[in-house]
From Swiss-Prot:
Gene3D superfamilies: 2,3-Dihydroxybiphenyl 1,2-Dioxygenase, domain 1. Residues 5-128 form the VOC domain. PANTHER family: GLYOXALASE DOMAIN-CONTAINING PROTEIN 5 (PTHR21366:SF14), GLYOXALASE FAMILY PROTEIN (PTHR21366). Belongs to the glyoxalase I family. InterPro entries: Glyas_Bleomycin-R_OHBP_Dase, Glyas_Fos-R_dOase_dom, GlyoxalaseI/FosfomycinResist, VOC. This is Glyoxalase domain-containing protein 5 homolog.
Length: 129
């Protein structure tokens, strides 16, 4: 077997509306509605998708122990990190750590800042150096 790429991931959240607002207005993602009866929400950016499940009302099948606030996600941006920091400051978003150097998925250095989403998931925003 050869896995080519990640198609989507599921994020369990306590409040779909708050989550959509944060990822759309703070991180610039697009909110989409989908499903047979348009009952589902997802966040899209580039060729990526994050499906949202409300804690306690998850769609089946689901993770064995779906938990809001347990994710640690790294997003790569082409926006220079100093501009990201300025924008986060203007939007009253607390930077928990950074800027600091880490190693990205390409085994190359990235420069990162860390913030929290409404469920306290750890969100890393990075530029490849």
């Amino acid at each position: 077997m050869f896995i080519d790429r990640l198609d989507h991931l599921v994020l369990t959240v306590s409040d779909i509306e708050k989550t959509c607002n944060f990822y759309e207005n703070i991180l610039g993602m697009k909110v989409i509605t989908f499903g047979k009866d348009n009952e589902r929400k997802a966040l899209t950016f580039g060729n990526q998708k994050i499906n949202l499940h409300k804690k306690g009302a998850e769609f089946e099948p689901k993770a064995l122990l779906p938990t809001a606030g347990s994710a640690d996600l790294c997003f790569i941006t082409i926006t220079p990190l100093h501009e990201v920091i300025t924008e986060l400051f203007q939007k009253n978003i607390t930077i928990e750590e950074g800027p600091c150097e880490r190693t990205g998925a390409l085994s190359k250095p990235i420069l990162s800042v860390y913030i929290r989403d409404p469920d306290y998931n750890l969100i890393e925003i990075s530029n490849y150096k």
